[in-house]
């Protein structure tokens, strides 16, 4: 069996780590409550974290554009979400760690709040669309696909940025954004841009170019933030409005600089060619990490328990704590996901379960085939 190359799998792991960094900071309110040097370093961490969701979207397009739609994969994801929602809420309800009324508990396990997992929501929709997107990608010519990507980026990234969010303002938390970056990943895969792009340069030179693009775009976003803050302090309603819009826009997934960072980082990792079974295995678990730590009851309580406060701790201590808590959350969620997989494997060994699963998948799969 061919082992998948580990360059993008390593990127998945790194990206999930920084997504957790983002959540630790934002769910704790640190970006709002911090001041001075602490605020500076927290914002640097946020700006190092914001583009990693877009990286995930590109990776999805890169691989899924050459893969077949598998209903079992979708059903497995939905089952995983339901499992964690039931187990986590039941654990906190029984132990009393989190206060529930009986009605609250029943609501939490029977009516799942998909909006809490907006990325998973978008992923499911894009996965359902993938047979149709892939048919289009396979049949369209290169120029047309490139033009489509440009139009999508203009509509959902560049125009909103230039107009301070007055046009097509989706913030990037949408299926539109996911489909756009799906096409970007598919384009890179279909036309082998990792080899073709900058082909006059050797590997080391390519890496330097991609890294330079990444650093310049990241620094540009940092400068944008401080320029926007400067505008908010001027005696002009118009400039204040633009400044306030840009302060927020730096953290939008549709920010052109964020998209450039994600693409350049993806291309940089495309220059690394190696395989590692351990990295691939851990990478296969990271979606579970996202689901666990973003489940409503975890998200609404965990960051209060962490008790991160800029009022009682110095900037250095708070940054160290952010990284430390991120590592703990990542490792604990990985271990939980390993246990969950073992449980599911044991359940699937039951003959009746396999039979029901096979019949259900075959029935629905036949309904959804794209001929």
Where are the predicted features?
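Alpha-helical transmembrane segments and their immediate juxtamembrane cytosolic regions
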Residues: 1-371
